């Protein structure tokens, strides 16, 4: 019954998937999966790390890599030189493509690991304590803010990129509390700036 449909339904069924099948293909199909992104090799170009996928394919399956590069070569324009092409590829990598994960961001370790504590006057005899630099030790600021608010029974908020404001003067106690909670922050990396104007 299935043979009758496939023989007669070639022109009449426009939406039928069977009319698009390759006649010379052997079923079941054998699909080559990439060792880097675990997708079929045809889809590697849509992943953010295309270069790694191509290196893997070239190393493990050079004949498939040759087919892939021959198929993609007519798409490239003849007028673009090597230098211009690589700059365009770098810019294209930065932008997230539809459906992909986007560029994987590298963490920067150039910032010195130092926690600074300052007492800032507010109104009359009221003060706030500013703690900066906890993010350089890869401490979650939201978690630290909740911890300080609970520990000192006061309001605390994350205000800047790497800044926590605690309502009240806790400069004496906070150094011990930080070292107790996060032992990776040693005594040498904590600096008390004293009273600082905003």
Swiss-Prot record:
Residues 9-20 have a biased composition (Basic and acidic residues). InterPro entries: DENR/SUI1_TIF, DENR_C, DENR_eukaryotes, DENR_N, SUI1, SUI1_dom_sf. The modification Phosphothreonine is found at residue 86. PROSITE patterns: SUI1. Keywords: Acetylation, Initiation factor, Phosphoprotein, Protein biosynthesis. Residues 95-110 have a biased composition (Basic residues). The modification N-acetylalanine is found at residue 2. Pfam families: DENR_N, SUI1. It comes from the Eukaryota. SUPFAM superfamilies: eIF1-like. Disulfide bonds: none annotated. Residues 115-182 form the SUI1 domain. GO terms for biological process: formation of translation preinitiation complex; translation reinitiation. Residues 1-20, 72-110 are annotated as: Disordered. One of its GO terms (molecular function) is translation initiation factor activity. The modification Phosphoserine is found at residues 73, 189. PANTHER family: DENSITY-REGULATED PROTEIN, DENSITY-REGULATED PROTEIN HOMOLOG. May be involved in the translation of target mRNAs by scanning and recognition of the initiation codon. Involved in translation initiation; promotes recruitment of aminoacetyled initiator tRNA to P site of 40S ribosomes. Can promote release of deacylated tRNA and mRNA from recycled 40S subunits following ABCE1-mediated dissociation of post-termination ribosomal complexes into subunits. Belongs to the DENR family. Interacts with MCTS1. This is Density-regulated protein. It comes from Bos taurus.
